[in-house]
Amino acid sequence: MAITRIGGATAITGTIPQGNIANASLGAVTALPAAIATGSVLQVVQAITTTAVTHVSDGGQVDTGLTASITPSATSSKVLVLISQNNKLERGSAALLNYELRLFRDSTEVEYWDSVCAVEVQNDGSFYGSNHAYHYQDSPSSTSSITYKTTGKIVSSGGGRTVRFQDGSAPSTMTLMEIAG
């Protein structure tokens, strides 16, 4: 449909054909129509890190280096957090290696996965490497910027255990999806 000008230069009605809209101008949209249904994906943010972090047993919680930020457009929005956390495990001379992963929204812990990896690996210095997938739906009730991050901790007792996050520049990813509430 062509654009129709009614009442001078200030009142315009009609539909702009899709081919006439530059993708770059879509980023300038600041308001959403009231008719967006709940459950609609409003925005997606992804962060990737390849920075290696080494954690040894009895070292407490360690920041894995995986972090992402999002600014929800409404306080009723949910944030779906999708994580692919890379790690390599070495149990040393111990029989078992167990570690936990925690998810923080800013400084608040919002999720905790216990014994996310319980493995028996050789004690000859070899490693067991993998990516683990996690998900969490958050209700932050905020329109301010929110930062999510993961931390890890070896929970098996005794020394000689090591967890290496993003070892050898292997990527870990965090995807944040704002869902209309």
Regions found by a protein language model. Give the residues of each.
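Glycine-rich, low-complexity segments
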Residues: 1-52, 181
